[in-house]
Every structure is written in structure tokens, then in C-alpha cells.
């Protein structure tokens, strides 16, 4: 891993103002090293997704600062955020959001056509663990786990520096979920991609470099694993 943090998060707050004021983040301080595999744990509403959305440029902080390498992205405008997302960040969510009328290969090609130095779509699908004979299948012809692997391939095809994953195994059974985690681990290992995974499954923390525990909008504690478990050894 690089010595320099890829993210530096300083006293970040997030307040949603409506009929009820919600303090989603209450002064988060955190440094994330390039090439780390992080798992974020905590109950619903503890701030995990809010922080990841801010890191990914999908939301903005109410206060504090977020640095990506040496750039303060805290108050980027929409055009700057769009460029930042396009050039540096890949996203994997619980729901796959594939285009139903396109094959697996074509879904990935949608990204590679606008990226600067993309992977070949077939290579991205192979790395994500989708069998070659399934590349020309449509989403409706694929299992949930296969669709998630297409979504992962789509996210990594542009070679992002950061891969942000919000409950990527949340809708999957244990066997399929482990295969998805193996794909994320391979991307982290082979490309040095910084990977953040939000999950409610405490056991997944064993495969991380560090586990960040959230509670009430704050980082409650941080665990460091001296050795990382293989996804296949995780008790679901």
C-alpha cells in the first residue's frame, strides 16, 4: 500500500434538514490508505452509507473536509464531482441496476466506451468471476450472483482507484455472496484498488485490513487485522 492516504477525512458532519433534522455524521475523522480493503460495520442509520456517498461524490458534507489525495473535494460543484466520479470511483450496490435489454458484455461496454483507459469488457467480466459462456446472456437469464458480478465488472472496467460497495452481498445467499467477495478481494489484490465494503455481516470483517465500526454518526472504534481471512473461510 502507498504510504500516503488516498482519503483524509477531517471532522466531517452531515445534517439533513427537513421536517426533522437528522445528524447523519457527527464529526468523523479517518484516514484511508491507498490499496486498503476496509469493511464498514454498524447498525442502520449509523452513518456508514452517508460517509461512503460523500467519499464517492454522490453527496456532500455539511462541515469538515474530505481530501482525495491532495485535493479537497468537500465543496466541489456538480461538474467537478461528475468528473471525479468518472475518473476515480467505481460503485457496487445491493441492487444491480443493469440495463435489461443489453447482454452482460454490453452492460460493461457502456462504461468502457466513455472511460479513458478501460479494461476490455470481457477481461473485466472474467476478473469479476463471470464464466465466459455467460457473457452474451441478458440479465434476466443470469442468477442474482451473476448479475452482481456483471455490476462489479462494470464498476472496475474503467480501472477506478477506489471501489465503494454498499451491501454488495445483501440480496445473495451465502455461497453466492462468498463468490462476490472473492471477486472484490481479487480486484483489491491484483490492481491495488482501494475497496470499501458496507455490510451488516460481521464475519466479513475478517477479510479486511481494517474494520471501521460506526455508531450514531461517529467512528466508534477501528479494528486492524494482522492477517486477512480468505472469503471462503468466512462463516456466513
Q: Which residues does each predicted region cover?
A:
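ABC family nucleotide-binding domain
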Residues: 5-208, 213-214
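Conserved beta-strand-loop-alpha-helix hinge in the C-terminal portion
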Residues: 218-236
